[in-house]
Curated annotation (Swiss-Prot):
Organism for this UniProt entry: Burkholderia ambifaria (strain ATCC BAA-244 / DSM 16087 / CCUG 44356 / LMG 19182 / AMMD)
Protein name: GTPase Obg
InterPro entries, A to Z: G_OBG, GTP-bd, GTP-bd_Obg/CgtA, GTP1-OBG_CS, GTP1_OBG_dom, GTP1_OBG_dom_sf, OBG_GTPase, P-loop_NTPase
Domain OBG-type G, residue spans: 160-334
Function, in words: An essential GTPase which binds GTP, GDP and possibly (p)ppGpp with moderate affinity, with high nucleotide exchange rates and a fairly low GTP hydrolysis rate. Plays a role in control of the cell cycle, stress response, ribosome biogenesis and in those bacteria that undergo differentiation, in morphogenesis control.
GO biological process: ribosome biogenesis
Amino acid sequence: MKFIDEARIEVIAGDGGDGSASMRREKFVPFGGPDGGDGGRGGNVYAIADRNINTLIDYRYAKKHLARNGENGRGSDCYGKGGDDVTLRMPVGTVVTDMDTGELIADLTEHGQQVMLAQGGAGGLGNLHFKSSTNRAPRQKTDGKPGERRMLRLELKVLADVGLLGMPNAGKSTFISSVSNAKPKIADYPFTTLAPNLGVVRVGPSKSFVIADIPGLIEGAAEGAGLGHQFLRHLQRTGVLLHLVDLAPFDENVDPVAEARAIVGELRKYDEALYEKPRWLVLNKLDMVPEDEREARVADFLARFEWDGPVFEISALTGQGCEALCYAIYDYLAEHSDAHRAAEEEDLATDVRFRDAPPADGGATPGDDA
């Protein structure tokens, strides 16, 4: 199936039905009074996150989604039927934004999460509501309210723990296929990967994390070179980025340091917050470097790149160093997940302490002796 990560749609909620202005007309019941029922409410439009869907392709071609109108009220106190709701199933990770106001309407991060996109109009009132001691036969009734109408932008940001960065042919697809069950297309030409790929890396019976491979970046991607940097949005939810560098390029004129700096520059142009994410340097294709040259080549790269963060030396093709890298990633994610959970618990405990704290001025509380 074709991978689509962006779409624009129009959602139209149903209009409310009109109220009825009817009088009770029945044998042996003179002056029966008003019996007009209310109109039904208009149908709502909802979005629900579904983990079994992984693309927005359904919304690339189906642009308009309408809910049904509510039925009009009728006599004999008959209320109109409410309009049927419409539920749009979207991939987990979809962000829904109002195109006219820029308002963030929904960020679907959990399976089954449901959000209202457009609310149906309220039904009108029948003349039954306007009866009074001075107006026994009212003819007033109200019309139903129109439903909401919105133009929405849908963006899919895949949910992954780890994101892969690198130039085309840096070995990202080979790496993800080596450490997970993902089967991306792998070839010896640039831009083999045209859409994000996800793989689950298992380091134990109940220990795993998700890794995302996106199409490669090149210098000038911010200006649209190559495939641009549109796929970088899929890395915004990750906990750590792996910057893969080809340490043994086939072209002797290619400088790995210059390519690595170009990737960092494009990352910063796209999003400062993404640039500030934890980033690990992964030097790949060491199997192509003679053993007696490896240490010197790695040291030269790190000195010129001026890198003082975590460094891992691997060969995605042979698997050398990949297992140690995966265990380090899992330990890092587990540690920071525990730290984040502890911080949330501390915030909650602090909030409880403040709620239960005595008055700051030391004044008497109700019930204290004067």
